[in-house]
């Protein structure tokens, strides 16, 4: 009997210890717990619905007013629904221009009923003071706001080194807003801990971010241990701005799930991924619904007997024009949008809904900029706009622009058929700020040698298939490349074209006038570092001196910077009014391509090896040396074997 009692006591203690270790245990006699979750990420200031092109079809999609309708319908069926957002809620439309004063995006997330969000890299676009001002403005509004979590900010390291002014601003704003490593929410009978993670690639994509961060997995593991120790929760969820990639070895949120297996659900933002089915990594479910509020993610989960959760249903609900917009939500969006006209567009003499041009041309979609390595008409019209605006600005000294450069990574939306408004043009190029502190990257004027221009073409030809944001579209320079040739030696022809279309050979040592946006100028200037010194592109002044601060070379239009989006708007307005209705018409010129970028797919051996540049010669030389070393090793081994015989 004593032995039986001891055995029972031992078993009881063992079960308690196991329950304590796992943090999860469900009483088999109880009904299993159930939770409905709605999620978004990468909304990028898309408060209003918008026209875009999807699979070659023009569609109206998105909009917080339609999202609100879907959320209301879901909450009628289950009032205890958890709503999560994966960050990058800002930067992408005109509403971002009042980011730091109105905090429109965060306030509207609160209005939707979002429970928890996190920070993405684009929340840092306006610098430390911009983020701090936005958080403070959100609190000052007095409105309902989502809780904000991020667990891997390394405050200890920053305190030890001494706060910079920007770090101090954000630290104080975090305290004011109540940003935490994690938060605990009760939904019906389900208690959920939600932590936030800021990914490694997000940090790489946030050049203005002054904060220091811990390794995401290590910080998440520590936070989960703290949750298990201090909170009696049923589920651990994570809003992560890290993303997923096709290559599982570098897919950050899949790595997070492997390294921190006690996380039940990861809402994965940053990479704009649209997952038709969740990614399952052990007992962790990873979900993504795509960008701009085009879809509302929904997942229903049930707790298993071991305390972990399984998916019952999962759906990405398209936010289409078939969904009725919630009127109260749209009214609030309109009120916030009105501040854009007053506080921002008045600086440029525009209004949000002003029509710039009528368009009958079918421009390529954004996705085609990733999938097609060729000339595209959207790149053509934007690069042509740069040339036009700079040559016609009030501060122009009459010098012609030789080349304008537009990378795919700076283009944020396409132009649809119908009226093109100021808002649509701004949304197509909505990134950054200038030295003047106003939203929008300015155009910069610089000089490159002919040799560097050819290198620009080679960046597109050799690198952009690995990094599609580096797909380059040029006005004034045409080139042909062969994708089958050796890397950094793919361009077979490169020349300039004037307004008359005549071919002009590029002289390697001559300086050429180049116009691009500030972001691209910085990107081209960093090519030397990114390529480990293999290739070099150094923006210069007209005397050939390297430019140290590109902001000082912004193109000015009177007393204000010429913003890239404003250059496009000016160009649109310059088109001929062909139907005589008082509004410009996009010309038929853009209905086709003009051999600006030509892919020569020849596999003829002569075409593949002719005209090798220094990179090809070096690579071939290395190959010959390597083969020689291998042959010497083989010869030596054979000689040794023969001696032993």
Predicted regions and their residues:
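Intrinsic disorder/low-complexity segments
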Residues: 8-10, 29, 617
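Catalytic centers of hydrolytic enzymes
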Residues: 31-39, 46-60, 64-76, 111, ...
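Intrinsically disordered, low-complexity segments enriched in small/polar residues
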Residues: 17-21, 194, 347, 396
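Positively charged n-region of N-terminal signal peptides that target proteins for export
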Residues: 1-6, 643-645
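Generic signature of intrinsically disordered, low-complexity, basic-rich segments
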Residues: 3-7, 24, 265, 398-404
């Amino acid at each position: 009997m004593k032995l039986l009692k001891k055995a029972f006591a031992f078993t009881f203690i063992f079960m308690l210890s196991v329950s304590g270790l796992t943090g999860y245990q469900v009483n088999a006699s109880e009904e299993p717990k159930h939770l409905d979750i709605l999620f978004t990420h990468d909304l990028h200031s898309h408060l209003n619905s918008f026209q875009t092109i999807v699979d070659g079809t023009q569609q109206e999609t998105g909009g917080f007013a339609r999202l609100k309708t879907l959320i209301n319908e879901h909450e009628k069926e289950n009032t205890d629904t958890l709503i999560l957002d994966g960050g990058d809620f800002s930067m992408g439309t005109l509403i971002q221009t009042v980011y730091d004063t109105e905090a429109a995006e965060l306030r509207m997330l609160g209005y939707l009923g979002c429970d928890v969000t996190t920070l993405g890299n684009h929340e840092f676009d306006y610098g430390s003071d911009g983020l701090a001002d936005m958080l403070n403005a959100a609190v000052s509004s007095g409105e309902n706001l989502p809780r904000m979590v991020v667990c891997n900010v390394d405050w200890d390291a920053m305190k030890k080194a001494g706060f910079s002014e920007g770090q101090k601003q954000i630290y104080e704003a975090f305290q004011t807003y109540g940003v935490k490593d994690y938060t605990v929410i009760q939904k019906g009978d389900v208690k959920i801990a939600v932590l936030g993670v800021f990914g490694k690639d997000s940090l790489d994509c946030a050049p203005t971010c002054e904060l220091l961060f811990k390794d995401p997995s290590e910080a998440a593991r520590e936070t989960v241990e703290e949750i298990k120790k201090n909170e009696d929760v049923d589920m651990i969820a994570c809003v992560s701005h890290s993303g997923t990639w096709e290559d599982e070895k570098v897919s950050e949120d899949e790595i997070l799930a492997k390294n921190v297996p006690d996380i039940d659900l990861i809402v994965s933002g940053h990479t704009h991924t649209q997952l038709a089915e969740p990614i399952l990594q052990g007992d962790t479910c990873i979900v993504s619904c795509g960008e701009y509020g085009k879809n509302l993610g929904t997942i229903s989960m049930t707790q298993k007997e071991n305390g972990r959760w399984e998916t019952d249903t999962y759906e990405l609900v398209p936010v289409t024009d078939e969904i009725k917009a919630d009127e109260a939500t749209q009214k609030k969006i309109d009120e916030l949008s009105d501040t854009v006209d007053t506080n921002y567009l008045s600086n440029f003499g525009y209004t949000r809904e002003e029509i710039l041009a009528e368009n009958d041309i079918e421009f390529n979609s954004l996705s085609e900029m990733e999938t097609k390595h060729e000339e595209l008409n959207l790149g053509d019209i934007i690069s042509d706009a740069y040339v036009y605006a700079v040559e016609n600005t009030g501060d122009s000294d009459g010098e012609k622009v030789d080349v304008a450069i537009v990378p795919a990574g700076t283009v944020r939306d396409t132009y649809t058929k119908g009226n093109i408004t100021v808002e649509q043009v701004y949304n197509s190029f909505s990134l950054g700020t200038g030295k003047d502190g106003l939203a929008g990257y300015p155009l910069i004027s610089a000089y490159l040698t002919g040799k560097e221009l050819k290198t620009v073409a080679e960046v597109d030809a050799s690198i952009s298939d690995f990094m599609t944001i580096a797909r380059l579209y040029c006005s004034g320079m045409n080139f042909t490349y062969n994708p089958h040739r050796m890397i950094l030696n793919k361009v077979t022809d490169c020349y300039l074209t004037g307004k008359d279309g005549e071919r002009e050979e590029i002289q390697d040592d001559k300086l050429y006038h180049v116009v691009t946006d500030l972001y691209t100028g910085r990107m081209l200037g960093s090519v030397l570092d990114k390529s480990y010194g293999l290739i070099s592109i150094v923006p210069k002044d007209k005397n050939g001196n390297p430019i140290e601060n590109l902001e000082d070379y912004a193109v000015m239009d009177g007393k204000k910077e010429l913003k890239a989006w404003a250059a496009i708007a000016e160009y649109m307005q310059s088109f001929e009014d062909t139907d005589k209705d008082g509004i410009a018409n996009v010309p038929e010129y853009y209905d086709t391509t003009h051999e600006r970028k030509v892919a020569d797919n020849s596999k003829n051996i002569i075409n593949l090896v002719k005209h090798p540049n220094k990179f090809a010669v070096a690579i071939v030389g290395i190959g010959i040396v390597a083969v020689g070393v291998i042959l010497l090793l083989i010869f030596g081994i054979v000689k040794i074997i023969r001696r032993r015989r």
